[in-house]
């Protein structure tokens, strides 16, 4: 075991100078309280994600235009009961109430048994006693274990009488201590004490071969919360919060399953939680392969994976929940040959997602599946004011996953099989007077089905003057024709077979390709990026339904501290006048929905702070775009308009989720502007280039500078998301960083630049002298121009200027999300145990032969600032825009060579012994271990099964 004290001294070696110089080491410094806690600057609301004067806050987006996004756990389709606060519950669940307060100087924990009991520490009674509040179901003395039965507390939680756990609230740097929830969570906050040799895993309920609450030898039973247990699993969920003000647990499996519970009908399948018919325990690895989840992430079926929200410096953390939910996330238990995954309809003898002889199957996102997987996604948020864990695979899969019925049938919810778009007229008169337009038709899942291209002619509701979006019918992710040969696709984007070996830039590229499919990336970048708008028509309406919904917004408002102006806007546009109608304070559902019923539009400025699935989408895209990808959500009542015509300074991707909305797009008055416009009047617009109605599942792209306005129709509301990218990411921004460097260094080297100005220069130059064309004036102008020509940037100056832009990305980026197969290879899956004497043991240890790599391609940036070598990183960023100062540490040159080697080796792994020498092998090992412990590195082979 390595010497931890010695490692601390190694950190001090390259951090000490920064400490003494008052440099920022890690993003623990906040801006002033007025900016960090509550920023009412309207620049934030009008230019989401843009620079603010003064303290910055993450808005999650950039533009003043219609932007947005969302995601949350849903409710049961049939019978959602509500408590006194209007919170939805499934009658089968043992849920709790949570008050999730964000930006709150004081945490107000809600009332569940765990929370109330954790407010006052429990005093465990005699040996074997049960937790306070556990209901007694036996004549056995209190807390004593019956031979066969585990008792439950009032919340339906299972307890083993061998446990005598206490609840602790471990809050550091907290203005008030808010207790965390049940024993499993609390034990994950503080290291668990392992018992004698042979004892059950940390937090495991049972040491018997029969799972807790299981009724017979072959059945996987559920506890009172509906949690599924297999005797081969000892999985639990942990919320690892450091410096946390309040942690609120997410609700149980039944609730999340009610989001998208699917009961499989066909022979051989079983619904979630059904009895097992296979000899392979749930989550146990099959003999041959690792599988992938719906995001293309590879999992080993031997994992008992859960979702984790790892928040550091977080005012709130919402842990994800139990087995049924985790299994509904991505766990697929394949029974006998021919069985299908949860919710999927089988049309082949080959297991769903299993590779056939020639083909790898993909989900709707183009992700590869294997029948042995049990994967989930994790969101690792640090320095977050709040983390809202997203829900299971069924939800993520619903981003694009469609359950295909019998062979030849159309996808569930598919519609609009006509070649005429909704709202478009095909009258003969309109055909004679308009120009045909080709728009892209997306397959139901934007990836799996063969794409089609249809030609439409604009009708009464789609006036068009020029061709927009002429698109070929090609395989998603590829291009055809002369570029590739007859019928041969190029640039096919396929996921890596192993998640921990994926290149995050390629993952982002593949994600974008799925959004714009069947248009190819080559066509998009060549013909439309920064050039012209286009529309993708889907053949199904549920393409983005898992990201946001009416119910999700209501739940988000209840469970999170969402404030007007900072997080949400109420707007209207009537008689050519745009108004913002924000009250003060927190935005609770009654207030928000009252404005909506009066015809106002609702804009959520930073939904990715609360909605994990939307955040996962943005995180993947930011790796490809190398800049923050933000999101806004817009909810507009029928026959309403919330915003005046305007243009934005971002590249916009509009995802229509619910209802329909009519968009009018106008040619730009200025190409690629650097700033957004103000509100424009209708008289400034002219004729629209595009006049279309977006339906659920449709996508619309338009570059920055293109004027747009949108209005709902009489018979429908509208809910849409706008993803925004590439704000302030131009050559002009690079030159603004570069030229000051050039001038500063040229002054040091050029005497003429340091000479004083002529005494008569004021009498010869300036606006008042512009009309005078005297000889002396011309000599002065020529001399100044000659000096400017000497300001030629060097390669080193260009590199340093680019690094300054990269630091901006490190500061703004969302923290990474971690997959289960990555979890067991990173610090986020590490655990510690302590014996009865308090001696702590770690479950990991790096060695010279350990192979490591960066967690993500853009996770770090090496820079030289004022002669000091620094490494910036974004693993500890918050979920709100620039909530903390940039995270970095200072390095010696030999430290820098190690990081540089890892950057160039990515995505490949490098053994520690093959990294550049650094004094001695022990110093190098400790430095690499220090990087791993900050979440920057990942090992190739897990230390243990997590």
Curated annotation (Swiss-Prot):
Kindly state which keywords UniProt assigns to this record, in alphabetical order.
Chromatin regulator, Dioxygenase, Iron, Metal-binding, Nucleus, Oxidoreductase, Phosphoprotein, Repressor, Transcription, Transcription regulation
Q: Which residues participate in Fe cation binding?
A: 646, 648, 708
Q: Which residues carry this modification: Phosphothreonine?
A: 309
Cofactor binding note from Swiss-Prot or TrEMBL? Binds 1 Fe(2+) ion per subunit.
Q: Give its E.C. classification number.
A: 1.14.11.-, 1.14.11.27
Q: Where is the composition biased (Basic and acidic residues)?
A: 117-128, 187-198, 257-268, 328-338, 398-408
Q: Does the keyword Oxidoreductase apply?
A: yes
Asked if the keyword Phosphoprotein belongs to this entry, the reply reads yes
Q: Which domain of life is it from?
A: Eukaryota
Give the CC-aspect GO terms. Answer: nucleolus; nucleus
Q: Which prosthetic group or cofactor does it need?
A: Fe(2+)
Q: Name one Pfam family in it.
A: RIOX1_C_WH
Post-translational modification Phosphoserine, affected residues: 339
Reactions this protein catalyses: N(6),N(6)-dimethyl-L-lysyl(36)-[histone H3] + 2 2-oxoglutarate + 2 O2 = L-lysyl(36)-[histone H3] + 2 formaldehyde + 2 succinate + 2 CO2
UniProt GO BP: negative regulation of DNA-templated transcription
Q: What is its main location?
A: nucleus
List the subcellular locations. Answer: Nucleus
Q: List the biased-composition ranges (Polar residues).
A: 17-28, 37-46, 99-110, 169-186, 239-256, 309-327, 379-397, 416-433
Q: Which GO terms describe its molecular function?
A: 2-oxoglutarate-dependent dioxygenase activity; histone H3K36 demethylase activity; histone H3K36me/H3K36me2 demethylase activity; histone H3K4me/H3K4me2/H3K4me3 demethylase activity; iron ion binding
Positions of the region Disordered? Answer: 14-435
Q: Residue ranges of the JmjC domain?
A: 606-742
Q: Where is the composition biased (Low complexity)?
A: 59-73
Give the family per the record: Belongs to the ROX family. NO66 subfamily.
Task: Quote the function comment for this protein.
Answer: Oxygenase that can act as both a histone lysine demethylase and a ribosomal histidine hydroxylase. Specifically demethylates 'Lys-4' (H3K4me) and 'Lys-36' (H3K36me) of histone H3, thereby playing a central role in histone code.
Q: Quote the protein name from its UniProt record.
A: Bifunctional lysine-specific demethylase and histidyl-hydroxylase NO66
Origin organism is: Drosophila pseudoobscura pseudoobscura
